[in-house]
Amino acid sequence: MDSEKLFLSGQSMGGYIAASCAPVIQPHGLILLCPGAGMWFGCAQRADGIMQTGKDYADMEGLCYKMAFNYEMAKHPDPFTEAKGYNGPVLLLRADDDRLVDEGTCNRYAQVYTAPVMDTIAGGGHNFATLAARAAVEEKTAAFIKANL
């Protein structure tokens, strides 16, 4: 492994985190799979509402996280501002039937980068949860990495 050619990748919330970290750690390449951003908007207010119910966590499609995460996230600039400053190769993938991350979000991320590669996967939803969608993601990701090594 060449430690100078590491690719940072994240899906959904992980895509938001990867996009936010890339300007700081400057990976060789960045792969964003249906990168989330919508969760940032109003995150502290949502946390307040959940805390008022007596819970200190949220369950988002089986991913449980503490409301402390939302409060910490609220301290940061919006996702698109925070993603600025990374100028390496970027791959943005989204399923055409994703109901959590819309095409506009991917387009806003794309505007941050110099020359992103954007593609849409047929079906599979937010988690690319069909064999065909998963295979397409793996194929496009592998091709992107090979092209940028």
What residue ranges belong to the model's regions?
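Gly/Ala-rich beta-loop-alpha elbow adjacent to hydrolase catalytic centers
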Residues: 10-14, 18
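Alpha/beta-hydrolase fold nucleophile elbow
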Residues: 1-11
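Short, hydrophobic alpha-helical segments
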Residues: 145-149
